Regions:
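Early extracytoplasmic/lumenal segment of secretory-pathway proteins
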Residues: 21-89, 222
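A bilobed periplasmic-binding-protein/Venus flytrap-type ligand-binding module shared by bacterial periplasmic
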Residues: 136-143, 178, 263-274, 293
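Periplasmic-binding protein-like
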Residues: 198, 203-207, 244-270
Length: 354
């Protein structure tokens, strides 16, 4: 009897223990650009899939690559690499190949973006286009009554300690444009010679007296404008959106030299333990209604043109969706930089210069 009682007691304990444990909802971990996990559109996915979204934000492509290669790749399920590092991440085995049959909205995405080779390696597709846009010149409309027509205004003697630049390689590209290194081939911005890089370095060191602070996050630049510490900077449409919502007098323009820009993809890391859930998240994020919601928050152009049907005419015009092809000619989309280490070396020398 004691033996039977003991077994029954153990079984009862097991039943009680099992019944007393509530299964925790899965957490999908993101490493993405700012604005890509806003509650306004992420919350609906959490509710419908009974999961949690946890997001960490990156300030540059180099930060993303460093984290993936530094042993923390297993901490993340979904990443949003830009067009300068997407191919490298896929080729390095840091992202998982996608089964496109799981993405009903994939064929709705811009054919131009889908057909780019950025995330295609050995016949596999490793990411879905998500958003795209420029790195525009942002300016205080009280200081500049008319939109500045050239990046060279940042070097103006009247702007000492009144501008900000992005702590990222895009600042090198911008200086290279001023020096004419984008002609005749804009792609040359991403493969400059040593001599050209040294000339870029000199040009950027000349800019340093005007730099109040280099920004690394969108929130940081937003604060610099709101605190009236700067009146001009290279920025993101997201920052323009944030400042306009705060009623700050901000303007945004692409100068006559044009500008660089990016195509961001969503990828699933090869180390993810939630690949099925991550795939469902990617599908949700490229659906037309979600793409419209992302544009509301970020001011970025949607990869899914069908998002336009949910927008007002003013929003479509502000995103240049009425003339996308012409708008894209003003943007030199980031490409892989073969000598990225050399570019970073030059940029670090600029930052260290007195």
């Amino acid at each position: 009897m004691k033996k039977n009682f003991a077994v029954f007691g153990l079984a009862g304990m097991l039943v009680f223990t099992a019944g007393g444990c509530k299964k925790q909802p899965p957490t999908l971990s993101l490493l993405v650009w700012e604005g890509y996990a806003d509650p306004s559109f992420v919350r609906a996915f959490e509710q419908s899939h009974k999961c949690k979204i946890s997001a960490a934000y990156m300030g540059s492509s180099d930060e993303l690559v460093a984290k993936l290669r530094g042993g923390s790749a297993s901490n993340y399920d979904v990443i949003s690499p830009s067009s300068d590092v997407a191919t490298m991440i896929a080729s390095a085995g840091l992202a998982a190949p996608l089964d496109l049959s799981k993405f009903p909205s994939y064929l709705q995405l811009s054919e131009r973006l889908r057909e780019m080779p950025l995330v295609r390696v050995n016949g596999n597709v490793y990411g879905v286009p998500f958003t795209w846009g420029p790195n525009p010149l942002l300016y205080d409309t009280k200081t500049f009554r008319q939109p500045p027509d050239s990046w060279t205004i940042l070097w103006g003697p009247d702007l000492k300690n009144k501008i900000s630049v992005w702590d990222e390689l895009s600042t090198i590209y911008m200086a290279a444009q001023i020096l004419g290194y984008d002609k005749p081939d804009p792609g040359h911005l991403y493969n400059l010679t040593d001599e050209e890089l040294n000339n870029v370095k000199k040009k950027l060191i000349e800019l340093k007296p005007n730099i109040r602070k280099m920004w690394s996050t969108g929130g940081e630049l937003t604060n610099l404008f709101e605190n009236q510490e700067v009146v001009a900077a290279m920025g993101w449409p997201l920052i323009t959106n944030q400042l306009r919502k705060a009623n700050y007098p901000i303007g945004e323009t692409i100068p006559k030299e044009n500008t660089t820009g990016w195509i961001d993809h969503l990828m699933i890391t090869s180390a993810s333990e939630h690949k099925d859930l991550a795939a469902e998240f990617l599908e949700y994020m490229i659906e037309a209604k979600t793409q419209k919601a992302v544009a509301d928050v970020t001011g970025y152009d949607p990869a899914n043109p069908q998002a336009a049907q949910f927008m007002t005419e003013d929003q479509r015009k502000s995103l240049h969706l009425d003339n996308v092809d012409l708008y894209m000619t003003r943007i030199y989309f980031w490409q892989q930089v073969p000598r990225r280490d050399k570019y970073n070396e030059i940029w670090n020398e600029v930052k260290a210069a007195q």
